[in-house]
Design a protein with these regions (language model features):
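Active-site and donor-binding regions of nucleotide-sugar-utilizing enzymes
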Residues: 10-19, 27-38, 51-65, 69-146
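Short internal beta-strands
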Residues: 45-53, 205-210
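Donor-nucleotide binding loops and adjacent catalytic segments primarily
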Residues: 174-239, 249
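Nucleotide-sugar donor-binding patch of glycosyltransferase catalytic domains
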Residues: 257-291
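Conserved donor-nucleotide binding/catalytic region of nucleotide-linked donor-dependent transferases
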Residues: 282, 287-316, 335
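C-terminal alpha-helical cap of glycosyltransferases
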Residues: 318-336
Length: 336
């Protein structure tokens, strides 16, 4: 592959592994698509470096579907920010490199990256070495030291829903949209889906078609299964979103939906607790089926003030915030 053609390189992963999932890759894909459009780039100008073996096969599956070029890291045991990883990344060069992962970059690693990459952007890095990057965005990892080049807070997120037109839906929104990320570690889709089905309600239940076999044939007839390509179309026409605390949750906030969240991992739990305190979401305790059932019944009977929740969401993350973040990223790319 001709390294001179690369304008932007992304280093991120997606995996059927707790704390990784698919959000980091989808966030990078969102940036890639928007920069491609803004700067009239081709897919040949954009390169992803991803792990592909074993549980990291999720990344390969997603990237191939999106038709971007990618380099495979075949050894899934290579550690983040190790000399081995640096050797692979520095086989290439580009105007900009974007690294998206929950980790801490070392000073040695980022300074040696500068030999091959003019500009560096970090997403959700937790180290003090973020100060050596041209831009660091921390929309979900918030307990970090502030630096001049770092923006910290939920409003600095990049979410895939920005790519999809928010067409006005004339019909009243209805139904529960269930989505627990690229890796539903705790099988919440099945557990919550079963609770909703037992309510025998008139409201629709929307679930991705790749989860169809989780449900018995007689239950499948009561669920509206959507294809992956219709994810955001279905999301827009849903009234309630039930999600984990990943990128899907932030899509729900920006889309101003009635949002019910169950944490899958520790960092998600922190954000969900914080957002609940700020009145932007409804938190669910997954182990208490009785309370979950009561919540759904109260929602359907309009006993919960959703307007207040939606007003609080607008202050936390909206599409103007996302557009401003993309302008910041574009400015880094353009700067000599």
């Amino acid at each position: 592959m001709n390294s001179s053609k690369n304008k932007i390189l992304f280093r991120c992963d997606a995996a059927y592994i707790p704390e990784i999932g698919s959000g980091h890759l989808y966030r990078c894909l969102t940036i890639a698509k928007l920069l491609k459009k803004k700067f009239k780039l081709s897919n040949q100008n954009i390169l992803f470096i991803i792990k592909v073996s074993k549980k990291f096969g999720l990344a390969k599956k997603i990237i191939e579907n999106e038709k971007f070029n990618f380099i495979k890291i075949l050894d899934h045991k290579i550690k983040n920010y190790s000399d081995k990883e640096l050797k692979i990344i520095n086989k290439f060069s580009s105007r900009l490199i974007v690294i998206d992962r929950l980790d801490k970059i070392s000073k040695n690693f980022i300074l040696r990256l500068k030999n091959n990459y003019k500009k560096i952007i970090l997403l959700d890095d937790a180290s003090n070495n973020r100060k050596y990057a041209d831009l660091a965005l921390n929309p979900t990892i918030l307990n970090v030291e502030r630096t001049n080049n770092c923006k910290i807070g939920y409003k600095y997120n990049i979410i895939p829903s920005i790519l999809h037109e928010r067409k006005a839906i004339k019909k009243k929104t209805d139904g529960f949209f269930l989505f627990f990320g690229g890796f539903d570690k705790n099988n919440y889709t099945k557990k919550i889906g079963d609770i909703l089905l037992k309510l025998n309600m008139n409201s629709k239940i929307f679930i991705n078609s790749d989860k169809k076999l989780l449900f018995k044939p007689e239950k499948r007839t009561k669920i509206l299964f959507f294809k992956k390509k219709d994810h955001y179309k279905t999301l827009l026409k849903s009234k309630y979103i039930i999600s984990a605390g990943g990128l899907g949750m932030f899509d729900g906030i920006a889309l101003n939906k009635a949002l019910i969240c169950i944490p899958q991992y520790n960092h998600q739990k922190k954000n969900i607790n914080n957002l609940e305190k700020r009145g932007a979401i409804i938190k669910l305790e997954s182990k208490n089926k009785k309370k979950i059932k009561e919540l759904f019944i109260n929602l359907l009977k309009n006993k919960i003030n959703l307007e207040k929740l939606k007003n609080n969401q607008k202050k936390i993350l909206n599409f103007n915030h996302v557009k401003n973040n993309l302008l910041k990223i574009s400015a880094v790319y353009e700067k000599n």
